[in-house]
Amino acid sequence: KITARQIRHAVEEHRANASHEHEVQPGMVYISNPTEVGTLYTKAELTDISAACYELGLYLFVDGARMAYGLMSEANDMTLQDYAALCDVFYLGGTKCGALFGEAVVITNDTLKEDFRYAIKQHGGMLAKGRLLGEQFLALLDGEDGTGNSLYFTLAAEADRQAMAIRKAFEEKGVKLLHDSYTNQQFFVLPDEWHEVLSKNFAMTHMGKPDKTHTAVRICTSWATKAENVETLIEAVKKL
């Protein structure tokens, strides 16, 4: 994660440089929530970042590819309304949350709304059968009343629950976490022999080797994860 203090420092350092025209001019802060390692920005942190952006004349963009999983996490204190109040632009992820394709962009800054549709004239942005993108989100968000009762959020909530069950199984075996994630992405530091055993039957993303005898991995659940597959993994972990 980044902080409001880091943003201020970076921009102020740029503006204090007498040759700043040779650098890219800061114009926007881009963050992901959840982050790529499953951590979450709190409402207080995002409020501070938003204030720093406003003070410095920057736009704030939030990558929401995994936003549903973040919103349904037990550690989350953000709402969609908070995102709308604090960000200039954010988007609801589709492909990671059950949609066949596409994302739903939400623009809250009125200045950025003007002429946005001209984006279809850039880089092949005109999507044939584009209505099908919207139809997916109509189905995923049907009946949503702010309580997370739509398909979009119930799928994410179940994936988070499954991920935390997997995390519990690994922690009970004394496995250390690479990152403290409370979302559908979990990161573990496994003894190499355990990694070799589990890799034969389960898909894990290799995240590097923190030392000569351990391997860091990422295990993800999603809208498509079956309960029986989670139970099979948990039973395999117990037998290590």
Each model region followed by its residue ranges:
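PLP-dependent aminotransferase-class I/II
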Residues: K1-G27, I31-P34, Y41-D48
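Catalytic PLP-binding core of fold-type I/II PLP enzymes
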Residues: Y41-S73
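Conserved C-terminal alpha-helix-loop-beta "cap" of PLP-dependent enzymes
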Residues: M164-A165, A169-K238
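Active-site C-terminal subdomain of aminotransferase-like
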Residues: Q25-T35, L40, M78-T183
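A general structural motif
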Residues: V24-P26, G57, H214
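Alpha-helical scaffolding segments of alpha/beta enzyme cores, especially the outer helices
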Residues: H9, A44-E55, M78, D82-A85, ...
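Active-site-proximal loop/turn and secondary-structure-junction residues that shape catalytic pockets
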Residues: T35, R66-A68, K96, W223-T225
